[in-house]
Amino acid sequence: MSWLKSMMEKEPPEPENPIGTVVIGNIEPDMHDTAKEAVRRSLKRAGFKTIDVGKSVAPQVFIDKAKETNADIIALSVNTVPAKNNLAKLDEALKAAGLKDKIMLIMGGAAIKKEDATAMGALFGKNKEEGVEIAKKAMAGKKK
């Protein structure tokens, strides 16, 4: 029932002085956005500006939006095996755009494990609380 509670929560306000910008979405063909929405709201409450690109999003859209908004982090929700299979395309798009070492990649979801994220050079959040803490630590390291 915690997912229902999180979906019924009010939309948090935009932070006045964001600690970072996060592009967040579900990689295609994943249409399950309940967890992504919970993470997005939690990031917003923690002081991040969030740019939601939606569900079933092509890898290049994440890249384009990250460049357009000068994002610090791309956060992915990966809840299906076909979506997991598209992570290699995202990795290639990050490399082609020259963003692989410039933007933090955080992922989580039912179809992915920590080992999958690590293999891509990404960080893994098993839940919304862990995802927010990882994002905060990433920004703290970036500010140094």
PLM regions with names:
Residues 29-33:
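N-terminal ligand-binding lobe of clamshell/alpha-beta domains
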Residues 134-144:
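A charged, well-structured terminal subsegment
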Residues 1-16:
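Long amphipathic alpha-helical segments
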Residues 42-46, 52-122:
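Cofactor-cradling patches in redox/metallo enzymes
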Residues 34-42:
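Short, solvent-exposed amphipathic alpha-helices that sit
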Residues 18-21, 102:
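Phosphate-coordination loops involved in phosphoryl transfer and adenosine-cofactor binding
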Residues 123-128:
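Short acidic-hydrophobic, aromatic-tinged amphipathic segments that line or gate anion-handling sites
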Residues 24-27:
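Short hydrophobic segments within beta-strands
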